[in-house]
Amino acid sequence: MADFDAVLKCWGPVEADYTTIGGLVLTRLFKEHPDTQKLFPKFAGIAQADLAGNAAISAHGATVLKKLGELLKAKGSHASILKPMANSHATKHKIPINNFKLISEVLVKVMQEKAGLDAGGQTALRNVMGIIIADLEANYKELGFTG
């Protein structure tokens, strides 16, 4: 619970501008881990040089961060939020669990830069994301998805 609270203390700047921060997160994810871009069919043809500032990427980044905000505010009681997300990401989008680990590290960096997430907050965010990803993976296994 303390980890969730520590992350939520720095969540304000993210909440204030989901679109910009979301765009930064996805752009950095795609630049640092180019294979992840292929998992998003609508972004697959966008050149690396054109990622930053792309409206569709920023809009999807905002969607990602809004969902994460819901998960953070649930403070671990997130089964009803996570289950439908796990279902769509396993059965429709086929997103391997490792990609959530990759985006978590990107999120730590972006929140450090844009939301003032200090070392303790970074550890808290990694812990929170570890909980969310473990629960997501458990849902994946129930669905028979081993990605």
From Swiss-Prot:
GO terms for cellular component: extracellular exosome; sarcoplasm. Its EC number is 1.7.-.-, 1.11.1.-. O2 binds at residue 60. It holds the Pfam family Globin. Residues 2-141 form the Globin domain. Transmembrane segments: none annotated. Its main location: cytoplasm. Keywords: Cytoplasm, Heme, Iron, Metal-binding, Muscle protein, Oxidoreductase, Oxygen transport, Transport. GO terms for biological process: removal of superoxide radicals. Gene3D superfamilies: 6.10.140.2100, 6.10.140.2110. Monomeric heme protein which primary function is to store oxygen and facilitate its diffusion within muscle tissues. Reversibly binds oxygen through a pentacoordinated heme iron and enables its timely and efficient release as needed during periods of heightened demand. Depending on the oxidative conditions of tissues and cells, and in addition to its ability to bind oxygen, it also has a nitrite reductase activity whereby it regulates the production of bioactive nitric oxide. PANTHER family: MYOGLOBIN (PTHR47132:SF1). Monomeric. This is Myoglobin. The lineage of its organism: Eukaryota, Metazoa, Chordata, Craniata, Vertebrata.
